[in-house]
């Protein structure tokens, strides 16, 4: 009997220098791709078209001190820091932390900041290169333990559909969204093609903590007469992913696609009971003015279609009378600054005190396996020696 899943982190981050995926960017576009430079302080900075200098900081903490800037992917001797190395190093870091697998999200430098690149062909080539490298050179070492999300471009529906299909061909189980499939911060009817294809392909949707833009509240200097209904029902519930959920609900996405599910990671989940309460209260308070009638309360839609990712969220595990704990997934957020590395097992023990074993298993293994189509009882890849 081999190694089994005991703890899966539903929230890890690929924080590596860009050299690996840059090789997959077509040569004609490579000079427009992001660059990592060494600063006089010894820290790293990112040069991305259309952005100011971007500093490594909270994204590469590992078990070092928290830094908001002046951090590096490299130790003083030039070796990779914790969380910034190759996939074998990452597997050893899982072992050190006492976990068996991670769901991996793209670094913010690739996921969001490259959206400022003006030439969309260049932008698309970078997204494609990152996904190719991730599948071919990183996750392939142990695809049952390094379970990454392919990144979906924000350059329009056609590009989103193409990369979704390519992600399936590359072997990904899940994709990460930054905007709605149409490429904007708001849903459009054409997005239905993407939702339908994701279900057809069996591709999970894991957009980190939100996607899309803020709900429209009009001129910030004006009164509430310009508010959208999404803005009204998220009043007093401003944290992610309330705006995304409100847009999906109000635009009928869940009614048209009752099988659609989303996993939102790293949510700091103790606020979720309040978010659900205010969304329901506001819906009943404001629906007549807006002339909106939903088939269900907002909280019902959310709980039927959403998994919530928790990190260091002990309070939410004491709120089972307010929100179903069966909808949660634990994550370490490694190597980011709010993470639990390398003491995840102790923190889990402390957080889950008094939680029955069946529920603990769902939060640590079962829910994320069901979302990704993994067998929770399968033998998994052992860590290579080097």
Residues of each region from the PLM?
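Short glycine/proline- and charge-enriched loop/turn segments
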Residues: 117-119, 223-234, 344-349
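Active-site metal-binding loops of divalent metal-dependent hydrolases
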Residues: 12-13, 333-334
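Catalytic pocket-lining loop regions of alpha/beta-barrel enzymes
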Residues: 125, 144-147, 152, 156-158, ...
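Short, solvent-exposed turn/loop segments enriched in Gly/Ser/Thr/Pro and often Arg
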Residues: 10, 40-42, 105-110, 150-155, ...
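Divalent metal-dependent hydrolysis catalytic cores, especially in the metallo-beta-lactamase
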Residues: 7, 71-82, 95-116, 146-153, ...
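Mid-to-C-terminal alpha-helical segments outside catalytic/metal-binding sites
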Residues: 2-6, 19-73, 77-96, 100-101, ...
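Hydrophobic membrane-embedded alpha-helices
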Residues: 108, 115, 120, 272, ...
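Active-site loop-helix segments enriched in His/Asp/Glu that coordinate
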Residues: 95-98, 109-137, 157-166, 185-188, ...
């Amino acid at each position: 009997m081999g190694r089994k899943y005991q703890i899966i982190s539903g929230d890890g981050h690929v924080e590596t220098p860009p050299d690996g995926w840059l090789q997959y960017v077509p040569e004609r576009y490579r000079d427009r791709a992001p660059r990592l430079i060494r600063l006089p302080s010894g820290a790293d900075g990112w040069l991305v078209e259309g952005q100011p200098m971007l500093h490594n900081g909270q994204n590469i903490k590992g078990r070092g001190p928290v830094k908001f800037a002046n951090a590096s992917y490299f130790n003083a001797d030039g070796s990779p820091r914790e969380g910034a190395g190759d996939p074998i190093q990452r597997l050893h870091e899982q072992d050190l932390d006492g976990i068996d697998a991670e769901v991996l999200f793209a670094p913010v430098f690739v996921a969001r900041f490259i959206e400022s690149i003006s030439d969309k062909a260049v932008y698309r080539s970078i997204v494609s290169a990152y996904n190719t490298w991730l599948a071919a050179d990183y996750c392939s070492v142990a695809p049952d333990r390094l379970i990454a999300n392919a990144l979906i471009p924000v350059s329009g529906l056609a590009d989103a559909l193409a990369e979704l299909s390519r992600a399936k061909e590359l072997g990904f189980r899940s994709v990460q969204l930054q905007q709605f499939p149409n490429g904007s911060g708001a849903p459009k009817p054409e997005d239905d093609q993407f939702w339908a294809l994701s279900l057809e392909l069996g591709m999970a949707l894991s957009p980190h903590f939100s996607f899309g833009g803020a709900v429209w509240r009009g001129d910030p200097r004006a009164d509430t007469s310009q508010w959208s209904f999404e803005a009204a029902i998220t009043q007093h519930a401003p944290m992610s992913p309330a705006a995304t959920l409100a847009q999906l609900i109000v635009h009928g996405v869940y009614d048209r696609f009752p099988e659609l599910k989303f996993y939102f990671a790293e949510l700091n989940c103790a606020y979720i009971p309040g978010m659900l309460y205010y969304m329901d209260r506001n819906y009943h308070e404001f629906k007549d003015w807006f002339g909106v009638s939903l088939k269900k309360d907002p909280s019902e839609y959310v709980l039927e279609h959403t998994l919530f990712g928790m990190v260091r969220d002990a309070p939410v595990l004491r709120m089972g009378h307010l929100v179903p704990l069966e909808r949660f997934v634990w994550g370490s957020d490694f190597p980011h600054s709010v993470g639990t590395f390398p003491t995840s097992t102790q923190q889990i023990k402390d957080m889950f005190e008094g939680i029955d074993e069946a529920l603990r298993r769902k939060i640590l293994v079962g829910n994320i396996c069901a979302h990704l189509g993994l067998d929770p009882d399968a033998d998994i890849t052992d860590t290579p020696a080097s």
